[in-house]
Design a protein with these regions (language model features):
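Solvent-exposed, extracytoplasmic
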Residues: 98-112, 178-223
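Extreme N-terminal signal-anchor transmembrane helix of membrane signaling/transducer proteins, especially
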Residues: 1-38, 42, 46
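Extracytoplasmic/periplasmic sensor domains and loops in membrane signaling proteins
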Residues: 92-105, 129-161, 202-203, 214, ...
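Conserved beta-strands of PAS-like sensory domains
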Residues: 138-141, 160-199, 263-267
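Extracytoplasmic/periplasmic sensory segments of membrane signal-transduction proteins
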Residues: 46-150
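Generic short beta-strand
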Residues: 118, 168, 205-208
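Extracellular/periplasmic juxtamembrane segments that couple receptor/chemosensory ectodomains to their
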Residues: 220-276
Length: 277
């Protein structure tokens, strides 16, 4: 009644403007902001999924290439025949090394920027021969040498010294079931992990764990407390870590060629900065 009978024309116009224009504009603005925020969040998730897939693909391709290389070297027929047929005959083994192995090894070392070192450990010699062949005696109690008595696949490990190794059993030629040596190749971990190291999207962070749950690589975000919170969550949820909450987005993936898990995350504050920038 007051609005109809007593309010002045000016007040009626002001109130009408507020009701008919200002309030709808506020509601529309809030809705538009919310929609823009959600669209940016959706776009960020899609981009993160694509980035994670691409990083894993690139790294898997590197591991596949280097795995094929170790397999090729471990299958050298003439060298295997010499190694099993001339056990403890240093002269014969050295001749075979010079002819069939060392030139190939040096070729791979000089042409493959990821490869640092190769050695073959064998029980068929009592002393080291040439640049690559070593007696197995000093390594008989190591985990990797024991494991590769029965495990014939190429195994990738980051060991306590922080170095990346590919280890593969060298088998006899007659039955391909008896170990006559172990090929051990060391690779530059930082070069292998380059697809992850060069990823830079909204100041993203990355944690990589091997099959034993050991952290082998970390790319930290700017907020140290947020970093610790995310790493704690990963530690508590190693198998199903992907999450979207009010503080961060975390994506998880497993690599195909090695038993590694990739955790890729972004602080949501960096997304908000995109809205206000």
């Amino acid at each position: 009644n007051w609005f109809i009978h007593n309010a002045s024309m000016q007040k009626k116009l002001i109130i009408s403007y507020i009701i008919l224009v200002s309030i709808p504009l506020c509601i529309l603005g809030i809705h538009s902001f919310s929609a823009a925020n959600q669209n940016l969040l959706d776009q960020t998730e899609v981009t993160m999924d694509n980035n994670l897939h691409r990083m894993c693909q690139e790294a898997d391709a590197i591991f596949q290439r280097e795995t094929d290389f170790t397999k090729y070297l471990a299958y050298n027929l003439e060298f295997r025949q010499t190694l099993e047929g001339n056990a403890y005959n240093g002269s014969a083994i050295a001749q075979s090394l010079n002819k069939t192995v060392e030139p190939v090894f040096w070729y791979f070392i000089t042409s493959d920027e990821n490869l640092k070192m190769i050695k073959i450990v064998t029980p068929n010699t009592a002393s080291d021969i040439g640049s690559f062949l070593e007696s197995a005696e000093p390594y008989e109690d190591t985990v990797w040498y024991k494991k590769h008595e029965k495990d014939f696949n190429t195994e990738w490990t980051v060991e306590e010294d922080g170095k990346l190794y590919a280890t593969r059993t060298i088998l006899d030629t007659a039955t391909t079931s008896r170990r006559i040596g172990v090929l051990r190749a060391e690779f530059y971990l930082n070069r292998i992990l380059e697809p992850f190291d060069t990823m830079d999207y909204l100041d993203n962070g990355i944690v990589i764990k091997d099959g034993n749950g050991q952290v082998i690589y970390t790319k930290k975000i700017a907020d140290e407390q947020m970093e610790q919170k995310i790493e704690a969550y990963i530690g508590e949820n190693p198998e199903d870590a992907s999450v979207l909450n009010k503080e961060y987005i975390l994506k998880e993936a497993s690599m195909e060629k090695v038993d590694w898990k990739i955790y890729y995350f972004i602080d949501r504050n960096t997304i908000s900065e995109q809205i206000y920038s």
